[in-house]
UniProtKB/Swiss-Prot annotation:
SMART domains reported for this sequence: Ribosomal_L2, Ribosomal_L2_C
Entry protein name: Large ribosomal subunit protein uL2
Family the UniProt entry places it in: Belongs to the universal ribosomal protein uL2 family.
Keyword field contains RNA-binding: yes
Composition-biased stretches (Basic residues): 264-285
GO biological process: translation
Pfam family, one: Ribosomal_L2_C
InterPro entries: NA-bd_OB-fold, Rib_uL2_dom2, Ribosomal_uL2, Ribosomal_uL2_bac/org-type, Ribosomal_uL2_C, Ribosomal_uL2_CS, Ribosomal_uL2_dom3, Ribosomal_uL2_RNA-bd_dom
One Gene Ontology molecular-function label: structural constituent of ribosome
Keywords, comma-separated and alphabetical: Ribonucleoprotein, Ribosomal protein, RNA-binding, rRNA-binding
Originating organism: Synechococcus sp. (strain JA-2-3B'a(2-13))
Quaternary structure (record): Part of the 50S ribosomal subunit. Forms a bridge to the 30S subunit in the 70S ribosome.
Length: 294
């Protein structure tokens, strides 16, 4: 994948960069194939609201209309080879997806690993060959391998390492658990029977793209964010004052008065703390209370 820089023929394109989409499939006329119709689904967009219509996540709404692509995160079609037919753009995620047609005729979308080509054969299962795009239990993957789409619980489907360019490394194996170094730097123990897909995800330059203008964020469904310091006191604890006034508190707070910007919100006695070997923040081993051990 490459990044194309636009000429500044308008102020908004001066700093705008776009992907050249070289990884995506095209037909003989240079056009992208249409998505598989049987794997498309309309999903009501929440716009940051809950079931009562109350805003629970600010700065969400609008954006271009999308159809959801049904992705096979479980990779539960075991022992049946499939052929990669296309590599496609997915508006619902940063990673690309590829359409796989299995020998029994079924078609599924999976996340597209880096360097997986059209025409490649993939498979899922304990006896699958060690190749990019194949899914197998973590206990059968050699140490040092980069994986993605990692399950946290057996059979639930991949829940971690699904963003563009992401990859987790298998660093240790102890008993029935396998330790993974996640993209955040955290080292976490996961059961060996959980499945993961071999390889790093494609579209690795996604984080280097500059949107260039506010309107491009609106296309993605991101609404403007207003700083609390420019609001009135009735709207935010940081608001009010003459001119550019300081916060006036010992720590920044949310619009509802709770500490923020560095304040830890994870529960100290969360049961899954015992599976975190090294935290992503301090780097130390966590004790039962979730604190980094000295």
């Amino acid at each position: 994948m490459g990044i194309r820089t636009l000429r500044p023929y308008t102020p908004s394109t001066r700093h705008m960069t776009v992907s050249d989409f070289e990884e995506l499939s095209r037909d003989e006329n240079g056009k992208r194939p249409r998505p598989e119709k049987s794997l498309l689904q309309f999903i009501h967009r929440k716009k940051g609201r809950n079931n009562r219509g109350v805003i629970t996540c600010r700065h969400r709404g609008g954006g271009h209309k999308r159809l959801y692509r049904i992705i096979d995160f479980r990779r539960d079609k075991r022992g049946i080879p499939g052929t990669v037919k296309t590599v496609e753009y997915d508006p619902n995620r940063s990673a690309h997806i590829c359409l796989v047609e299995y020998e029994d005729g079924e078609k599924r979308y999976i996340l597209a690993p880096r360097n997986l080509q059209v025409g490649s054969t993939i498979m899922a299962g304990p006896e699958a060959p060690f190749e990019i795009g194949n899914a197998m239990p973590l206990e059968r993957i050699p140490l040092g391998t980069v994986v993605h789409n990692v399950e946290l619980y057996p059979g639930r489907g991949g829940q971690m390492v699904r963003a563009a360019g992401a990859g987790a490394q298998v660093v240790a194996r102890e008993g029935k658990y396998v330790s993974l170094k996640l993209p955040s730097g955290e080292v976490r123990m996961i059961r060996g029977e959980c499945y993961a897909t071999i390889g790093q995800l494609g579209n690795v330059d996604h984080n280097n793209i500059s949107l260039g203008k506010a309107g491009r964020s609106r296309w993605l469904g991101r609404r403007p964010k207003v700083r609390g310091s420019v609001m009135n006191p009735v709207d935010h604890p940081h608001g009010g004052g003459e001119g550019r006034a300081p916060i006036g508190r010992s720590t920044p707070v949310t619009p509802w008065g709770k500490p923020t910007l560095g304040y830890k919100t994870r529960k100290r006695n969360k049961p899954s703390n015992k599976f975190i070997v090294r935290g992503r923040r301090r780097g130390g081993r966590r004790d039962k209370g979730g604190r980094a051990a000295q």
